[in-house]
Amino acid sequence: MLKTYTTKSRIFQRQYERRKRRRERRKRLICTILAIATIFLLVYAGCIGGKKLGEKISEIRYPVAYSSYITEYANDNNLDPYLVIALIKQESNFVADARSEYAGGLMQLTEVTAEEYAKKLGLTDYNYMDPETNIKIGCYVLASMIKKYDNIDTALAAYNAGVGNVDNWLKNPDYSSDGKTLYYIPFSETRHYVKKVNQYIEIYKTQAVIQSDNRKDE
């Protein structure tokens, strides 16, 4: 009787241990699945959060303000709005009251240039530092230079370094082979300027940007 009981006890013990091992395997499997699911969710959330953070950083680095003024006066002068946006980014980074040694405003106009082109536009009582006025005059100046040189890069060089310098460079075979386009710009600042404006054009065509209300930014 004792032997029979002992045999049954061992059988029950083995069955219990097998059930225990199965429960432990199921538990480990469930824990593994939960861990994988948690990792997946964290990675997914990180990707989404990272994307949104990247977009926010992009918006900060590449903002657009006064967009309706830019669109209006770019269209009035047959200019690519992205060109105007890129130029303003390089000139003032959309700071309306930005000033350098000689120029001011969003498109960094000198008082002399603003006065010359304001007359051509029929403006009498004006403030060239006003955002709308600055963009209006600046777009007209840029369009005039593109018309004069029939080349955007040459026009950008003239916008930065002045028409007199560019005209002299075009006459120099070291800088121009045809007298119309510049294959080398002797001023390093102007070379960098033209390069950066072109880079910004491509960036703004692909980046999500802030479209700010004009009056809000004034």
Which role fits each region the language model picked out?
Residues 12, 40-43, 71:
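Residues marking helix boundaries in flexible regions
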Residues 1-27:
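N-terminal Lys/Arg-rich, disordered targeting/topogenic segments
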Residues 48-218:
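Catalytic glycan-binding domains that act on GlcNAc-containing polysaccharides
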Residues 31-48:
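Hydrophobic membrane-insertion alpha-helices, especially the h-region
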Residues 9, 34-37, 144, 207:
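Residue-level marker of intrinsically disordered, low-complexity segments enriched
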Residues 19-20, 27-36, 90, 107:
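Extended, non-globular alpha-helical segments
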